[in-house]
From Swiss-Prot:
Residues 1-8 form a propeptide. Keywords: Membrane, Photosynthesis, Photosystem II, Reaction center, Thylakoid, Transmembrane, Transmembrane helix. This is Photosystem II reaction center protein K. SUPFAM superfamilies: Photosystem II reaction center protein K, PsbK. It holds the Pfam family PsbK. NCBIfam families: PRK02553.1. It is a single-pass membrane protein. The lineage of its organism: Bacteria, Bacillati, Cyanobacteriota, Cyanophyceae, Oscillatoriophycideae. One of the components of the core complex of photosystem II (PSII). PSII is a light-driven water:plastoquinone oxidoreductase that uses light energy to abstract electrons from H(2)O, generating O(2) and a proton gradient subsequently used for ATP formation. It consists of a core antenna complex that captures photons, and an electron transfer chain that converts photonic excitation into a charge separation. One of its GO terms (cellular component) is photosystem II reaction center.
Length: 45
């Protein structure tokens, strides 16, 4: 179980990217929204 916590925490060298890593899982949702807006713009052809 401790290995899971070790893997969940970024190494110290990458701590500056910690806020970025928190945002990364949301990116596919933006692509889904973009696809919907694109289809709405072309009239769902």
């Amino acid at each position: 179980m401790e290995a899971v916590f070790l893997l969940a925490k970024l190494p110290e060298a990458y701590q500056i990217f910690d806020p970025l890593v928190d945002v990364l899982p949301v990116i596919p949702v933006f692509f889904l929204a973009l696809a919907f807006v694109w289809q709405a713009a072309v009239g769902f052809k």
